[in-house]
Amino acid sequence: MCNRFCGLVIKGIKIKPSSEEIKNKLISIGLKPINNVVDITNLVMHELGQPLHAYDLDKIKSGRIEIKTLKDKTVFKTLDEQEIKLSKNDLVICDGDIPMCLAGVYGGYEYSVNNQTKTIFLESAYFNPISVRKTSKNHSINTDSSY
């Protein structure tokens, strides 16, 4: 269900507002600027068509990132702080057995980049589009990444 998963660790990150140029580009395509890291991932996705996701690496406690499914009804808190119950078919990116991201759909709140973030894990992946679509529809979550 995941044909390619690549990641890069970037240390010494300083979270700050994006440049006016990047903010204006995002606003022109209907996106709200958030911070330099999130904004550049959104801009890359819109300009190149490749979704990226940034995680705060210091929040990943198991020391390993896994792509898998979890038990039915496992609770996952999304970036917008909504709690959803996963189905046993939802592909997720995990910190051990803790869901960090709905694969190809939406990130998780607990691992999000914020003003205290110093190190990120930047993900670029290709997930099975049928799996992404099913997960997106199952939870009524439509994001630019899930198209």
Residue ranges, per PLM feature:
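RNA/tRNA-interacting regions in translation and RNA-turnover enzymes
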Residues: 1-147
